[in-house]
Amino acid sequence: LTANDSSGQLIPDDKLFEQVAIAAPYLDVVEEMTLLEFLSFQEKFHPFQAHTDLESICTKLGLHAARHKQIRYFSSGMKQRVKLGQALFAAKPIVLLDEPCTNLDAEGIELYHRLLAELTTNKLLVICSNDEQEIRTCNERIDIRDYK
């Protein structure tokens, strides 16, 4: 895999990871932090897209009312929204989503599709899933069974 930065320069292999945001149900969040604390902490390592503030991220994730609660008190669906948010709002050109709708209810799945449409237009988006509703907007698909 090779990639170029925004100026067209080749990104060295050992720096490619810096261009990637990832969300997966098995990745942990710091549950002792409130949502705002966690997003602020994340932003120090992985800045969010320009013109995006923490309050608006909470609102767009449907979690504004819970922004001052510790994440340990979130449902599994709320935690998945946080994981998706930290990846999708990141100022990274590559987004990897593994089973992105795990633990999401119908409202959360619709939110997921809205966020994809809004936040990934100029990004390489890779979704790993066997669930049709998670990949319904994908233009290209790679079926791993074709390579066994």
Where are these regions (language model features)?
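Conserved ABC ATPase "signature" region
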Residues: 51-66
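Conserved ABC ATPase signature
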Residues: 70-79
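Conserved catalytic loops of ABC-family nucleotide-binding domains
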Residues: 115-135
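Hydrophobic anchor residue at the start of the ABC signature
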Residues: 84
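Catalytic Walker B motif of ABC-type/P-loop ATPase nucleotide-binding domains
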Residues: 95-99
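Q-loop/switch helix immediately C-terminal to the Walker
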Residues: 26, 31-47
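Helix N-cap at the start of a conserved alpha-helix in ABC-type nucleotide-binding domains
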Residues: 106-107
